[in-house]
Amino acid sequence: MVWSFADNSDPRSWASRSRARRIRLFERLIAHLPDPVRVLDVGGGPRFWREYLRGGGRPLQITLLNLDPGQRAEGFDLVVADARDLHMFDDAAFDACFSNSLIEHVGTFYDQQRAAREMARVAPVYMVQTPHR
């Protein structure tokens, strides 16, 4: 029961429906931006975006930012860095920033604020999601 609730491969699961809602919200946020949209995904991985692109989503240029160099994947740029310090990127280097269920894992509340400020600095449009506790 719990597995089917959280199974992203089952389109009827709560997890899949929740992911689909997040994508629809993100699509509304980037609707006014020209193609291809330059997206920085802070803490994400390629699987999420492959599913989005396979579903006929808009053309995106995706940069994954992660502490784990193992997130490297064909078709995606990978930057190994900490969300609290995005000094390698200029202001508004991306059209949009996306971060799904990461910020609650970023140190103290002060650290989380630093990460949020950095995401807002590098992209004028951003979506930072965290689970309700």
What does each model-identified segment do?
Residues 1-34:
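Class I SAM-dependent methyltransferase Rossmann-like catalytic core
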Residues 30, 37-133:
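Conserved SAM-binding loop
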